[in-house]
């Protein structure tokens, strides 16, 4: 995998490499795939797009777009808030974008990927009433007691083999604390992400040395159930209001993966 300052990419990845790549960056960065695929839509109607070269775009808010080599509009798309799932079946990489209300499913069967790109897009000119996960992280670094008394955040966007940890820190008992941040209602996929990160740290440091906390304004019923089953925690926290521009310099200075003093 090649890395630039804000861009991570793979050229002609294997199915396994692509699976790991999407697992690491989906819902965090903008994903762009240049791929050969078939597309199936089922919802208010049914449609099928035969195999061809397409540009697939998955945005952090769940928006899913498929472009051909002509025209401005995507040939298929799903709105923000859609769930994204993926699997490997008979050597095909399958992406699904699922919208629950109204019920719609966009299924992309990928036979070949020429290029996969993850772009860390930070648009500070945009004014949001609801802040991004980056702004949530900045807010937590400024006031760690929002999570709990004695919490010490150490690193943001800490990369491990199973993904990118939003915030890594320690509690007052010196246990590792992994925070998964969601600016909207957290679903099953958010819990699954957190579970993978916690399992990695438990394998490294021990079962009783690691905690995982999902931080978001609310939870789906399924997410709440899975959190309890996996002995993970939930902290209700709304993202900050205001301009991303105001936090531009603070956000950049807080990003670090230097943990030598803690490890």
UniProtKB/Swiss-Prot annotation:
It is found in: Cytoplasm. Pfam families: NucS_C (PF01939), NucS_N (PF21003). The keyword DNA-binding applies. One of its GO terms (molecular function) is single-stranded DNA endodeoxyribonuclease activity. InterPro entries: Endonuclease_NucS (IPR002793), NucS_C (IPR048301), NucS_N (IPR048302), NucS_N_sf (IPR049173), tRNA_endonuc-like_dom_sf (IPR011856). It comes from the Archaea. Its EC number is 3.1.-.-. Its main location: cytoplasm. GO terms for cellular component: cytoplasm. Keywords: Cytoplasm, DNA-binding, Endonuclease, Hydrolase, Nuclease. Belongs to the NucS endonuclease family. Cleaves both 3' and 5' ssDNA extremities of branched DNA structures. This is Endonuclease NucS. It comes from Methanocaldococcus jannaschii (strain ATCC 43067 / DSM 2661 / JAL-1 / JCM 10045 / NBRC 100440). The lineage of its organism: Archaea, Methanobacteriati, Methanobacteriota, Methanomada group, Methanococci. The gene is nucS.
